[in-house]
């Protein structure tokens, strides 16, 4: 059965932000030609989860990114007609349906996990039109190899580097900040680059 109250919570990008309700956020449900990135973009499967955690981090950091902060996550599909076609195809398909979807307990082989990698581009703009870019890259499949290393390093960081952290439900940025980034670079195959 459908639970309208739950659907409303799941649709709210601020549902984990301790009661804060910020400005209207960009829609991550439809493909569009993103002028900031210079490419067509399509919905990203993890965006509904990740955006809530980013807004929770901002709230826990006393709105370090601003109370008017807007955030969305999309998959870059390329410029022009080809980028538009790929974006529309991605938006119309469900990666959790079909004959080739792994069954519970199945997943990529060890070789596939180790050969995987990712490159995430963050683009920020302000009201004056200034732009900043950052990238995060990982040396293994993000859903399996890299995630397990991030979880292990987060646990070690909390135990060894954040002894004074009071109890609570945190996101990584307010709980561990740069201490976690240092561990991820040193031990988990991640690289962080803050461009201009």
Where are the language model's segments positioned?
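C-terminal catalytic/substrate-binding lobe primarily of soluble NAD(P)-dependent oxidoreductases
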Residues: 1-196
